[in-house]
């Protein structure tokens, strides 16, 4: 620990609340446990593994889409320490994209952030099915309930609580529909109603704090499981931990600037859809191929997204789950002026 830094320690009241949270999560993991776990090696899945080990959890699955994927060493450590059979699904970006059409069909979206993460989830679930694992655990919900996302950490207490309440009310996770499509049941202990209700009563001091000089979220969850070596690991989203975060660069390298500019201009003119970059274009093209003229999401209704025309989830939502626009209620930027870039 460097000079001037301090390790975050719980107060007496926080220790009591941490014990309550530990008890609730322990009850939320069924006995016997599902035999499989989608394991990233981060705090959330490590906590689930800690509870489920000894209740029937035997197999851990980790998707690795790049040689330096941050999840790999952490997931190996967790699986090894708990004696789990660890399946590393090693692939590259083109291999990961083999699941893209199926994921688009199930989720009915061309949102880059959603798909970048969900192709990883789909690959893990597909491997579970191949291995004959009928049911898996996930860490879904912890970030939304306990302020795991860095964009929340600077918010004042009242604003933070309001934002978390709205996030909890609108939580949706691709693992459930993808698992259903693949015939693998998904269980998420953090989404147990008792855990959700408990999290709704927490204040900022239980959610955000400074530990060893670094601001972090999910403070009470970390206090509840101090024996987990990954308790203070930084938050890496699925796309970062697995390596799928390189997909934007990958698609940009596949698309010459002139071809992208022409496609973006044509799609906006003909379809009324704003394409943001080459990755977004690739996903929209798959969306078109999968659904043709009959997407399962409504278009042209009373509350359309200005960026794609598809219906927004609800009147209070400022995020489009179909195209990924945020803030979705702000008018899109005008089409860039000037000539289309020359061919390279």
Feature map (PLM): residue ranges:
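Mid-to-C-terminal catalytic subdomains of enzymes
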Residues: 136, 141-157, 168-272, 295-302, ...
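Structural preference for long, well-ordered alpha-helical segments in enzyme cores
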Residues: 21-29, 43, 47-52, 78, ...
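ATP-dependent adenylation/pyrophosphate-handling site
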Residues: 5-11, 28, 34-82, 88
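N-terminal glutamine amidotransferase
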Residues: 1-4, 12, 26-27, 121-122
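A conserved beta-strand->alpha-helix junction
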Residues: 7, 72-107, 135-140, 145, ...
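Short, glycine/charged-enriched secondary-structure capping and boundary segments
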Residues: 52-54, 74-77, 102-104, 150-154
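Conserved adenosine/adenylate-binding substructure
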Residues: 20, 24, 31-36, 95-151, ...
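Adenine-nucleotide phosphate-binding core of ATP-dependent small-molecule kinases
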Residues: 6-23
